[in-house]
Amino acid sequence: MKKYEYPELGEVLYKERLENGLTVAVVPRPGFSKKLAYFVTDYGSIHTDFTLDGREIHAPAGIAHFLEHKMFDLPGGRDVSAELAALGAGTNAFTSYDMTAYYISCTENFEESLRLLIEFVSTPYFTEESVQKEMGIIDQEIGMNEDAPDSRVFENLVSSLYREHLIRVPILGTSRTIREITPQMLRDCHRAFYTPGNMILCVVGDVDPDRVAEIAAEMLGSEARSVGRKLRPWQEPMDSSGEDPTMAMEVAMPTFQLGFKCEPSQTGADAIRQEVIGDLAAEALFGESSELYLKLYEEGLIDSSFGGGFETVDGMAMLLCSGDSYDAGTIREAILSQAAKIVREGLDEADFLRMKRSALGRRIRDLDSFDSTCFRICAYHFSDFDYFRFPSVYQEVQSGEIQEFLGRVVQQNRCALSIVNPIQEESEHVY
C-alpha cells in the first residue's frame, strides 16, 4: 500500500486501489486496542434512478435503507450480529441521503471480524418472506420518525426548499413506497452499487495495512465489475417555493428550522472549500460568539437549543439553523438583516482569523474520534478529495469569500422557515 504522510496533522494514511476497483484506506493508531472498520458504498436514499445492463431503473423511495436492513441476512439463517458478538465485535450500519455504511468495532479477533463484515455486505440474500417481514419492521420505524418533531420540522423544511432534489423525500421512504419493494429490486440495487469499484474499506487502529488489503482482495476476488450509472434528473432552481410550513405536535414550545438554498455540492478540492466557507459563514452569522447570537439570546428569542451550520448532499447544499423559539419569524428577519450588514461592512480581520483558527482546531481535534475519521475519509473519497489535506483549505479561505457567500445565499427568495407548534397553541398563535 502507498504511504501518505501529513506532518501538520501528525497523521499517516495507507491507501491502495485493488485490482477489483475497491479503495482500501488504513489510518494506523499504534498502541490503541480499539479497531474500527467502515465498509461503505457511494449509494444513498436519493439514488433511486439509475441504469443497469442498459435498463433504466426507477426504484421506490426508501429502497437504499431497506437494502441496508436486509444485508444482515445470510443464507442458512445465519445471524451476522450474533457471529460478530461471539468474536467480541460490535456492528451497525446507517443509510444517509448519499451513502450507506456498515461498520465493526472490536479489540480482538479483528481479522475474523473484518472477513465477516466484507462477507455479509457482499452477499445479497433476499427471500419473499424476509422482505415482507422487513416491511412491517420498517413501517414501524417510519411511524416513529413521523412522531419525532425534529424529523418532521426538517422534512417539512426541505420539502419547501426543494422542488426536484430527492432530499425532499425521507430516507426511510413512506409506508406506501416500501410496499413496492421486491427481492428482485433489492438484487438490482445491490448489483448496481455494492460493487468494489463503488465502495471504500477504511480501517482505523493498530493494524497491518497490507494485511487489510490482502483480506479484502481474498474476500472479493480480482474481478472488476461494472457499476450502475446514477441518473440525476434534478433541475433545481435556486429560489424556494415561498411557503413556510407549520404543523402541530406534542412539543413543549415551538421548534423551528430555517434554511437557505446554496449552489449544489462540489467535488474534489472545491467540495471541502465549499464546506469550509459555508461553515465559517454560519459561524460569522449566527455562531455562539457572533454579534447576532448574543443579541438574540439577550432578547430571549433563542436559548441553548439554537445552533446551525452548513450541510451538503450529492447535488445540493444549504445553510440552516434551528432551535426552540416563540418568534422564529423575528429570528429570520434578524438573520437576513445581519447578513446584509456583514456584506456591507465586512468582517473584522482579526475576528475572522480567530474564528478560522478555532474552526480548524475543532476539525483537528475531531480526528481523535475513530468514527469521525473513518466517516470523513469515506465521504470525501466519494467527492474525490483526500480528507487529510483540509488544513491547507482553511489557510487559503479569505474573509471576502464569506461576505460573498452571505450576500449570495442569505436572501428572502432562497429561504424557508419550518415550524412545529405545540398542539394547544396551533390555533392560538401564528408564527
PLM ranges: what are they?
Residues 2-15, 160-199, 233-234, 363, ...:
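Histidine-acidic residue clusters that define the catalytic metal-binding segment
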Residues 149-153:
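Mid-domain, small-residue-enriched loop/turn segments at the edges of structured enzyme/sensor domains
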Residues 1-79, 187-295, 415-431:
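His/Glu-rich zincin catalytic helix
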Residues 143-147, 241-253, 360-371:
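Short, low-order "capping/linker" segments at domain edges
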Residues 122-129:
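Short, polar/flexible loop-turn hinges at active-site or ligand-entry regions and domain interfaces
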